[in-house]
Curated annotation (Swiss-Prot):
Localization per record: Secreted
Domain ZP: start-end pairs: 99-342
Disulfide bonds: C64-C74, C68-C80, C82-C91
Domain (EGF-like) ranges: 60-92
The protein, known as: EGF-like domain containing protein 1
GO CC, alphabetical: extracellular region
Signal peptide residues on this chain, from the entry's feature table: 1-19
InterPro entries named among the record's database cross-references: EGF-like_dom (IPR000742), ZP_dom (IPR001507)
Keywords: Disulfide bond, EGF-like domain, Secreted, Signal
Stored Gene3D superfamilies: Laminin
Tissue note: Prismatic layer of shell (at protein level). Expressed primarily in the mantle with highest level in the mantle edge and lower level in the mantle pallium.
Length: 348
């Protein structure tokens, strides 16, 4: 993110955010207003993470005939309104979780109808969860069993005496991407564990940024990790694939630059890269979509060159992007001469 101070210095801070629901992703529904950040904003009559239930239908006490789990809320007397992290009739199933068996861990993922991406263990895209018969209406189910003794690249991480003496914990990081063979800012990572106790429990939680398959950084001519620069100064955005051994190249397929007015909540955005081709914007900022070889990792990393610019005074520039993964250096698309883009989109 580029921050502009009153001294015309642009400060840079880059981060990734993971969430299990984003109404902008294919398959997810929103019966309210889908916010740019991915949350579904309900009107005064609706509730739920996707605004799918009338508040007037919520049931309490003797009016409710079922026991909802995992903080689910009863409605219509016999149904459960789940959070985005759970599904099933009683909210008893995690959208990304595990069943702990005597000889292995069965990873499970429930995705909405319309999901056309991939769900796989972080070790390799070849460790995909495979589609199976779903036991939740309206959801696609993916699963994969990994045996405790598996020594392949899909093998589990094993921890002895964790969290308590005598316990054994197996874990894996599950990547979920909504576009095949790519990674974007609206995709997410879950850390899934099986803790072997007298009763076996599967746990899932958001993974830290260090586990994401992309590391984003910025540099200028003088620094490889630039923290501040002036308006119109040249900036290079670097996108390095990490944690995926069978990926040796990455290139930006789509990148959008946007900013939000913290007072009015208005946002404006411009598309800088589309289908791998740099776009011309009304801010007269030139973008170049390239790649370069990292001599340390022998990996081709995505590289977007641009100039620092302002959308809203004293507000940061933010980035929404999607990268294409390749087993070697990515081929470059054939791009036509860029045309002047339309006025930036706005929303309140």
């Amino acid at each position: 993110m580029f921050y502009l101070s009153t001294f015309m210095t642009i400060v840079i801070s880059l981060s990734l955010v993971s969430c299990s629901y984003d109404c902008n992703n294919p398959g997810f529904t929103c019966h309210g207003e889908c916010h740019y950040y991915g949350s579904c904003i309900c009107n005064e009559r609706l509730t739920g993470y996707d605004c799918s239930v009338l508040k007037s239908s919520l049931s309490t006490g003797s009016d409710c005939k079922v026991t909802c789990q995992n903080n689910g809320r009863c409605y219509d007397g016999n149904k459960c309104l789940c959070s985005s992290d759970y599904t099933g009739h009683l909210c008893e199933k995690q959208t990304t979780g595990a069943r702990c068996t005597l000889d292995g861990v069965v990873f499970e993922a429930y995705r909405p109808i319309g999901f056309d991406g991939e769900t796989y263990l972080s070790q390799s895209r070849s460790c995909k969860l495979l589609q199976s018969e779903s036991d939740v209406p309206g959801m696609i189910k993916f699963e994969r069993k990994i045996f405790h003794g598996d020594t392949s690249m899909c093998g589990l991480k094993k921890h002895m005496d964790m969290p308590n003496a005598g316990d054994i914990t197996y874990e894996a990081d599950i990547y979920s991407t909504f576009v095949y063979n790519s990674w974007g800012t609206r995709d997410f990572v879950d850390n899934v564990k099986c803790q072997y106790k007298p009763t076996r429990v599967g746990l899932s939680m958001d993974a830290p940024d260090s586990l994401f398959p992309i590391k984003m950084s910025a540099r200028d001519g003088a620094s490889s990790n630039v923290q501040a620069t002036t308006q119109s100064a040249p900036i290079s955005l670097l996108f390095s694939p990490q944690n995926i051994p069978d990926v040796k190249g990455a290139m930006v397929d789509y990148m959008e630059v946007y900013s939000i007015n913290s007072t009015s909540k208005e946002y404006k955005s411009v598309v800088a890269v589309k289908n791998g081709c740099a776009q011309k914007t009304e801010y007269n900022v030139a973008f170049d979509n390239l790649d370069e070889l990292d001599p340390v990792t022998s990996t081709w990393i995505g590289l977007v060159k641009m100039q620092a610019f302002i959308i809203f005074e004293n507000e940061p520039l933010l980035f929404n992007y999607r990268l294409r993964f390749c087993p070697d250096r990515c081929s470059k698309p054939t791009c036509a001469a860029p045309a002047v883009s339309q006025a930036p989109s706005t929303a309140v």
